[in-house]
UniProtKB/Swiss-Prot annotation:
GO molecular function, one term: DNA binding
GO BP terms in the entry: regulation of DNA-templated transcription
Subcellular location: Cytoplasm
Name this polypeptide is given: Probable transcriptional regulatory protein jk1057
HAMAP family: Transcrip_reg_TACO1
Organism, as annotated: Corynebacterium jeikeium (strain K411)
Keywords: Cytoplasm, DNA-binding, Transcription, Transcription regulation
Family of the protein in this entry: Belongs to the TACO1 family.
An annotated GO cellular component: cytosol
Intrachain S-S bonds: none
SUPFAM superfamilies the record matches: YebC-like
Region of interest (Disordered), residue spans: 1-22
Length: 251
């Protein structure tokens, strides 16, 4: 199990201040707006939009904010920005490979923010293609355990193309090929298994174990990157063991 995945599911516990929470809300709202613009404003006919709305609701984003974002994206209301997805590549402390996914209406600002965060936190930018080949696009669903066992989840999604089910502590994670994400979503719904989120992700083909010192430096860099309003996601090839995670949590 990739330690970064578990860290990501518990990260909201560490986002205690209002500024962090506000940034998280802004990223979720942006996802809704882009999904509505790309696939239309009707969630029942646009699974990506429905998933973005579900994730926002699970994160306690107010319904009014969600609805306004949907309308901006679909063109029902004015004010939608011209969002552009940009993927930056680089290396973090101790050579950890990183992909930084931005959703921005200002490419120059995004580039400056990412470069500044990398330079100040032991990272460096890399040429396009020099890091991305280490990662594969995957579909990833995250769900509360509830009464379900790992076998229950696997049984529900295996025929839909799921490759693995990972135990993240309080939650399960289902990983599939990116082309199978719709089938896995449908399988979860058919089995009446509620999920927090289901979206496309990047997973490292080979992960590199990290000790507590390296992990702490990389997580600090990720925090600095995610402080930028333009950064939506950060992916790494770092694997953090349960022992190292426990050591970091105790600090």
């Amino acid at each position: 199990m990739a330690g970064h995945s578990k860290w990501a599911t518990t990260k909201h516990k560490k986002a205690a201040n209002d500024a962090k929470r506000g940034k998280e809300f802004a990223k979720l709202i942006k996802n809704i707006e882009v999904a509505a613009r790309t696939g239309g404003g009707d969630p029942s006919a646009n699974p990506t939009l429905q998933d973005a709305i579900t994730k926002a609701k699970k994160s306690s984003v107010p319904n009014d904010n969600i609805e306004r974002a949907r309308k901006r994206g679909s063109g029902e209301e004015a004010g939608g920005a011209n969002w552009e997805t940009i993927m930056y590549e680089g290396y973090g402390p101790n050579g950890v490979a990183m992909l930084i996914e931005c959703l921005t209406d200002n490419r120059n600002r995004a580039t400056t923010d990412v470069r500044t965060a990398m330079n100040k936190n032991g990272g460096n930018m890399a040429d396009a293609g020099s890091v991305s080949y280490l990662f594969t696009r995957k579909g990833v669903a995250v769900l509360d355990k509830g009464e379900n066992t790992e076998d229950d989840i696997l049984l529900a999604v295996l025929d839909a193309g799921a490759e693995e089910v990972n135990d993240l502590g309080e939650k399960f994670e289902v990983v599939c090929e990116s082309s199978d994400i719709n089938a896995v979503r449908d399988a979860l719904k058919e089995a009446e298994i509620d999920y927090d989120s289901i979206e496309l992700d990047f997973r490292a083909s080979m992960e590199v174990p990290a000790d507590a010192t390296t992990a702490k430096k990389v997580f600090n860099l990720i925090d600095a990157l995610e402080d930028s309003d333009d950064v939506q996601n950060v992916f790494t090839n770092m694997n953090v063991s349960e022992d190292v995670l426990a050591e970091l949590d105790s600090e």
